[in-house]
Regions:
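Walker A/P-loop NTP-binding motif
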Residues: 8-22, 108
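Short, low-complexity, charge-dense intrinsically disordered segments
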Residues: 435, 439-451
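SF2 helicase/translocase ATPase core recognition
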Residues: 99-100, 104-107, 112-148, 182-210, ...
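Generic structural signal for small/hydrophobic residues in well-ordered secondary structure
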Residues: 3-4, 11, 27-30, 41, ...
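Inter-lobe coupling linker of SF2 helicases/translocases
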Residues: 69-70, 74, 80-84, 143-250, ...
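SF2 helicase/translocase NTPase motor core
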Residues: 19-103, 150-154, 259, 264, ...
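Conserved Helicase C-terminal RecA-like lobe
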Residues: 10, 19, 183-201, 206, ...
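Hydrophobic residues on the short alpha-helix immediately C-terminal to a glycine-rich phosphate/catalytic loop
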Residues: 14-18, 37, 135, 208, ...
Length: 451
């Protein structure tokens, strides 16, 4: 399902209404979501007995029909106990955690014995079709055949295999979208906001491109195959300079050197003044720290909250953001945004550094645009004009249809070598006029006003 449509409550309703006699159940989820499952059970089904798997408290200790809640890490640590217990239901929440069939945690889930198996996810196609094979290796081990035969068929006839795959999997997938289920949800307005580059950014970007091309050559496939570390390092440096040159390890720059942060602060002025709440997402915690600094300078009285992978109590900042009466900004790392938080008190979302996985972005946005939202949600993807960021956005738009063919819009990463043969074409800065940037910003403002 898309995020926020009540997968948790649906599963708990099933476990309560149709239990397997005398069998315990197992719910496996990211560690940050364990408290969420416990709270939902206590709230809606207080008669159901629960227990949390941890060191010193495991399956051997009790044999009654309890609902075990386990993080993926704890399940892996207790793998040797799995042959000793058979569950009624085995539920994997955020099933993309087992997308890599070679990972130890994935192998552990394959060892689970149960009468029924359920996987909950909004994004099973995060990277490649093998992710889907891995999920179904847990659900129905023989359905898609061996991994080697599956990959051979894909390599021989990708289009034909994807068509057959969709038909083969359709009976086993319940795919619900907001437009089907949450018809009361207000509109979501999405737009790319093109950000200008400062002279410092432009100079650093050009220098990094030049040095990267000298080291890697112009053949994207060869660079990925033979110098993958250098290729990824080049992409990371270019993304960093697009956001803020201060993120480069060899520079210390004032906030004014970042065109993206400058435009963000400018866009926030009217939003905050009008009393709205805002969620700002980034993959870079370092960039969020810089935005926090800029917000403190420009809006010293603004209430700020933060949620990153380093946040110990993930529930607290979300709850405080949801309940505070004043305009507020929540700074969230994409890594922390994937699971277990609701932020629908906000109605403005800024994605500071969109990249090539639309599924990750959708997960983040769905923290705001979900059941309970009562306002139109405005989503800005901040894309630095004329750079690799803009090229990746164009690529995502043109290739979305390819991934729609498999399971209706679940999204996925892209192999850059399939779409760019020339590294220079991928990374080199193109000359974008500031007039275009201003036009796009004006159009974005118009979209808000029209709504």
């Amino acid at each position: 399902d898309e995020m926020g449509l009540g997968k948790t409550l649906q599963v708990l309703s099933l476990l309560a209404a149709r239990p397997v006699a005398e069998k315990p159940d197992l719910i496996v989820c990211p560690a940050s979501v364990v408290p969420v499952w416990r709270e939902e059970i206590e709230r809606y089904f207080p008669h159901l007995e629960t227990d949390v798997l941890k060191t010193g408290n495991d399956f051997v200790g009790r044999t009654d029909p309890v609902i075990w809640i386990a993080s993926y890490t704890q399940l892996r640590k207790h793998r040797e106990l799995l042959p000793q217990v058979e569950f009624g239901y085995a539920v994997l929440d955020e099933g993309q955690f087992i997308k890599n069939p070679d990972a130890k945690v994935t192998q552990t889930t394959y060892a689970v014995r149960s009468h029924h198996r359920i996987v909950l996810t909004g994004t099973p196609l995060e990277n490649r079709q093998l992710d889907l094979w891995s999920i179904f290796r847990f659900l129905l081990p023989s359905l898609l055949g061996s991994r080697s035969s599956f990959e051979t068929q894909l390599n021989a006839d990708r289009a034909g295999t994807m068509g057959r795959l969709r038909a083969q999997l359709a009976p086993f997938i319940l795919r619900r979208t907001k437009s089907q289920v949450a018809t009361e949800l207000p509109q979501k307005v999405e737009m790319d906001l093109h950000c200008p580059m400062t002279e410092v950014q432009r100079a650093e970007y050009a220098r990094i491109c030049s040095e990267g091309l000298q080291r890697l050559g112009d053949d994207v496939s060869a660079a990925i195959r033979e110098k993958s570390f250098g290729f990824l390092a080049l992409l990371t440096r270019l993304r960093q300079v697009c956001c803020d040159p201060d993120m480069l390890p060899w520079r210390r720059s004032p906030l004014s050197d970042s065109g993206k942060i400058g435009l963000l602060i400018e866009k926030l002025a009217e939003v905050i003044e009008s009393g709205h709440k805002v969620v700002i997402f980034s993959q870079f915690v370092m960039l969020l720290d810089r935005v926090k600094e800029a917000l403190s300078e420009s809006y010293p009285n603004l209430t700020q909250f933060e949620l990153t992978g380093m946040t110990l109590d993930r529930q607290k900042p979300g709850q405080e953001f949801q309940t505070c009466d004043d305009p507020a900004v929540m700074l969230v790392s994409l890594k922390a945004a994937g699971t277990g938080i609701t932020l629908h008190a906000a109605d403005y979302v800024f994605l500071l550094d969109p990249w090539w996985n639309p599924a990750v972005e959708a997960q983040a946005v769905d923290r705001v645009h979900r059941i309970g939202q009562t306002k139109t949600v405005f989503v800005y993807r901040m894309v630095t004009a004329g750079t690799i960021e803009e090229r990746i956005q164009d690529l995502k738009a043109s290739k979305r249809e390819l991934f729609d063919k498999l399971i209706g819009g679940l999204g996925g990463d892209f192999d850059l070598s399939q779409h760019f043969s020339s590294l220079q074409d991928l990374v080199t800065l193109t000359q974008e006029t500031t007039e275009k940037d201003l036009d796009n910003a004006d159009n974005a403002d118009g979209a808000e006003n029209d709504s």
